[in-house]
Amino acid sequence: MMFGRFTERAQKVLALSQEEAVRLGHNNIGTEHILLGLVREGEGIAAKALQSLGLEVSKIQEEVEKLIGVGKQPTQSIHYTPRAKKVVELSQDEARKLGHSYVGTEHILLGLIREGEGVAARVLNNLGVSLNKARQQVLQLLGSNESQAGRQGRSGQQSNASTPTLDSLARDLTVSAKEGKIDPVIGRSKEIERVIQVLSRRTKNNPVLIGEPGVGKTAVAEGLAQQIIDNEVPETLRDKRVMTLDMGTVVAGTKYRGEFEDRLKKVMEEIRQAGNIILFIDELHTLIGAGGAEGAIDASNILKPSLARGELQCIGATTLDEYRKYIEKDAALERRFQPIQVDEPTLEETIQILNGLRDRYEAHHRVTITDEAIEAAASLSDRYITDRFLPDKAIDLIDEAGSKVRLRSYTVPPNLKELEQKLDEVRKEKDAAVQSQEFEKAASLRDSEQRFREELETTKNQWKEKQGQTDSEVTMEDIAAVVSTWTGVPVSKLTKDETDRLLNMEKILHDRVIGQSEAVNAVAKAIRRARAGLKDPKRPIGSFIFLGPTGVGKTELARALAEVMFADEDAMIRIDMSEYMERHATSRLVGSPPGYVGYDEGGQLTEKVRRKPYSVVLLDEVEKAHPEVFNILLQVLEDGRLTDSKGRVVDFRNTVIIMTSNVGASELKRNKYVGFALDNEEKDYKDMKSKVIEELKKAFRPEFLNRIDETIVFHSLEKEHMKDIVTLMVQQLQKRLKEQDLHLSLTDKAIEKIANEGFDPEYGARPLRRSIQKNIEDLLSEELLRGAIEKEQQVKIGLNNKGEFIVLP
């Protein structure tokens, strides 16, 4: 059977009739199942007609069961009976007679009545409803009668029946407003007033709402529909119907050439004749190219004449980008629409909107939303969710927080789960006892089952009562938790563990980075400021430039910070600036310009920060990059934002930016004196720092340096630091060996010798790594290959009499 012309509700009726057949255990779908489907659908004209005749689902089900009984589960695929097929064919014929281009629930009911001999007809007669009376009721609801049925819906009627094609393709916003299905529209009175002004013009009376996604363009059209229902519009717009047309629905199912144009022409003719329709086309840019196959004209060109003459009142809605990309290119279409800018609401307006919607979300989630939660949703979404717009993102926060709180409160208690498990076990044991014919045991288990079932029912009812009495509350903390889940930025209140970790951050960092207290303190203070909520919200958490000779821990401190913040040292965004030495390579940071290879891939820096807005950004060896790179970084350091090649603004306000550089390393090498008294060392460090800063000023522009929070000069490593660093490096080696079930330890003398061998003030800690490779790793690899070391063995390395490294027995 062909269901192409059947409306969504009509198709739902047929699906429900199949469900009824399965429920009753019947192998075929008969007229009685279609009747049950019509009543169960509940919203169509047929359901309303049957309800007005006093027919309820339970009554019809009872009568059907009485007439044909209940079977077992159907054993084969379910098919329509010949009578049911005839009803479907007659419904199409009824639609044709009434001049409707669609088949709705009312036509199915008319077909059912016309067939007149099936089980459905008997059910209706038994319930005291004559078929003729049922038919008259349907036609009355359709705004028609028997004498009008053959006239194919004349234009004189101002009812819904005069626009059958439009009704099948569009949704009536005024009906939704009347039924209270539209959310209240708050703070858009200026935009609605401007829309009314444009609609009241003689020609070109077509407003188009332009604004960013999520600012409330569709809400303006819904607000107009609500005002029409409340009679708060001028006389010119009284009794108008606002119909929202989805171009996808208009195009859907148009298989043959000319079908789309015919459908659209019918819609336009119906609108012209009805005279009381305001068409709302959301995503207006979909008009361009819609239905425009090879040689055919698209929807926008079909609508242009009517739009210009004022025969068609149309409200459009589209985003700024799509308006520019599609509508502005077609000047003839653009001049027929009057643009109305819908701006993003302010924080105060967003709070008003959320307060207006609060009742709807409280009723849906069965929770109470506090004033603090409303304010937090507006302020936190504005601050942390930067790629979307108010009020949409704030509403989404409230919605998800409500969902989260409700699900949390509806978690089944453990004692209830335990009772359900016990009941299942007893039921299985009883079935097993019956199978093995142990009837006494089965009787005893049946009593236990009954007892458990009663206990379960009582416990479940008590839990449900308790749930119904106490409404869960959506608090500021719940909103903050959702923001953290979305963005990865921790905005919830500090826990005791986190507070302790932040206060002891220096100690944690000192365990990884030896001998650089100034750098560690500066970074720790920046993180504490941010987490306590005292940092400047318009700038990054902190921006640092680490200077010093090679191998003193500049990059290591960035890794350690990432581990403290995210429990993973690889969680930082690392950009090796030596890759950006050529001028043309700088575009890779923000993405290639249009027309170049890699435009669709996005920037290497911007894309990573968009995905992880709360992160440590390490720009390693920054002096190796081309000077143009620093121009890109200016607005990142000052305003915490950067625009990528596609025009998207990337938010850097929740990042820690660390740049490392070897500028002035030669000065450090020349001016490092060992063995002076403490006072002299401090004075020496200050002199050396000032010289390095001078070198830095020569290498970088003042506007770049002026935007950096702190410039930190790392100390050269002292001999006393070496043992601690060797211990750290050996711990890393121990971790690698542990994976092979080997346990390594070194004697103090062995550690001391590595520290002495690897000490070089000019090269920092890296020579120690080479010393460990040469003396420890090479020795272990030889012993492993020789088979002298077995798995699960404790391996101790020390020195022999000649001072050589050996594996001790």
From Swiss-Prot:
Organism: Oceanobacillus iheyensis (strain DSM 14371 / CIP 107618 / JCM 11309 / KCTC 3954 / HTE831)
Keyword Chaperone in annotation: yes
Stretch list, region Repeat 2: 80-144
Domain UVR: 420-455
Name used for this protein in its record: Chaperone protein ClpB
Domain notes: The Clp repeat (R) domain probably functions as a substrate-discriminating domain, recruiting aggregated proteins to the ClpB hexamer and/or stabilizing bound proteins. The NBD2 domain is responsible for oligomerization, whereas the NBD1 domain stabilizes the hexamer probably in an ATP-dependent manner. The movement of the coiled-coil domain is essential for ClpB ability to rescue proteins from an aggregated state, probably by pulling apart large aggregated proteins, which are bound between the coiled-coils motifs of adjacent ClpB subunits in the functional hexamer.
UniProt xrefs under CDD domains: AAA (cd00009), RecA-like_ClpB_Hsp104-like (cd19499)
Lineage: Bacteria, Bacillati, Bacillota, Bacilli, Bacillales
Family membership noted in the UniProt record: Belongs to the ClpA/ClpB family.
